Amino acid sequence: NIDLEILKKTKSFCLIHSKEINHPVGSSLNKRVLKSLGKADFVIANSKFTKELGLKLGLKDIHVINPGCNYPIVVSETAREFSKNIYGNASPKLITVSRLDGRKSHQNILMSIKNLLPKFPNLKYVSIGDGDERKNLQKLRKELGLEKNVELIFNSTEQEKVGLLEQSDVFVMPSVVYKKSVEGFGITYIEA
């Protein structure tokens, strides 16, 4: 049996990441979310950006606690060799780790790579992740003639991912508002 008196005294926390509160004002989903958040004793946003979204919706007293990540993984020799085989003697070495969806702006990265090649002909860009944009990005890579300079890895082990991150010079992750979707605080920024 649950003691209802204890439950009534228990403080409730609600963590918001931006996507779940970024619904049209006045929509039924917006009203339900605001009602639920209004019942929480503490509302915690994962970023200042998300806090601002919440304040615009009328939420009050939002606290910001940025997410963390696990301690760095010790990279195995196998993973180091894997990443050396991918990057070779490239310079600079760029990387993105994320889902392949519109709000991540991968198509803009590929177009930027194309524009950077005259100045950096040995550039290598690695994208690790999979998603709805997979076929579009494969097609765009081919259309732009980037097969030699762009590696799309759709499935990798954690060791391979960390090995590639360790070998890279620049972590690339633009974020755009895509329809009503926005990246509030990408965890991969911290992992990189």
Feature-to-residue mapping (PLM):
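A short, histidine- and acid-enriched strand-loop-helix "catalytic/donor-clamping" loop
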Residues: S12-S27, K39-F42
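Nucleotide-activated donor-binding/catalytic signature segment of Leloir-type glycosyltransferases, i.e.
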Residues: L37, S91, V126-I128, K135-V162, ...
